[in-house]
Regions:
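Activation segment of ePK-like protein kinases, specifically the conserved APE
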Residues: 16-17, 96-99
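Regulatory extensions appended to serine/threonine kinase catalytic cores
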Residues: 79, 83-90, 98-171
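Carbohydrate-binding surfaces of carbohydrate-active enzymes
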Residues: 93
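Conserved C-lobe activation region of Hanks-type protein kinase-like domains
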Residues: 1-2, 7-85
Length: 171
């Protein structure tokens, strides 16, 4: 299940969730790879430990070529929407060293389906990304080009019956 989380993160954000360029000392490449992907693995977007954010070390002279994907202030994992954000945190923070905490494949599937429902087409026809995930704010704009969304957004609130005569919002 870890590989599925990594693939989804890489596919959507064009970077590896654990390869941030953390320095482990003077060791050979194989040992460094084992630490980076194993016992010392650290999510590049960990909320309290930013020691794995040395993208210059990871990408070298190609750092600029891979922007905005190497700029976490412009493309944080949170731009993937609330459903995937939660699962990335579960997979790469809570479950990184505790496999039982990782989301199931079915949970990923449901989150991807729900996220697809939040997809909006950018109002800027020149935007390289073309689409972005609605972030449920009044000032909806594309996180990639900064263009304000020019259309109205129909919003449906779904409720489920929590217990008899008690209804709660689904999201």
């Amino acid at each position: 299940l870890h590989a599925l989380a990594v693939l989804i993160y890489e596919y959507l954000l064009y970077r590896h969730p654990l390869k941030g360029g953390k320095y482990y000392g003077q060791i050979d490449e194989v040992e460094e790879e084992n630490l980076m992907m194993g016992s010392k693995a650290l999510f590049v977007e960990h909320p309290t430990d930013n020691s794995n954010r040395n993208f210059k070390r990871e990408y070298g002279d190609n750092l600029e070529k891979f922007k905005p994907w190497t700029d976490l202030s412009k493309t944080p994992y949170t731009i993937t929407g609330p459903y995937l954000k939660e699962l990335f945190e579960q997979a790469f923070i809570k479950g990184l060293h505790n496999p039982i905490e990782r989301p199931t494949a079915d949970t990923w599937e449901q989150a991807l389906i729900k996220t697809n429902d939040l997809k909006l087409q950018c109002s800027n026809f020149k935007c390289e990304q073309k689409w972005f995930i609605y972030n449920n704010t009044k000032d909806t704009k594309c996180p990639f080009c900064g263009t304000k969304y020019a259309h109205s957004i129909p919003v449906l609130d779904f409720y489920y019956q929590f217990k008899p005569n008690v209804w709660k919002p689904e999201n």
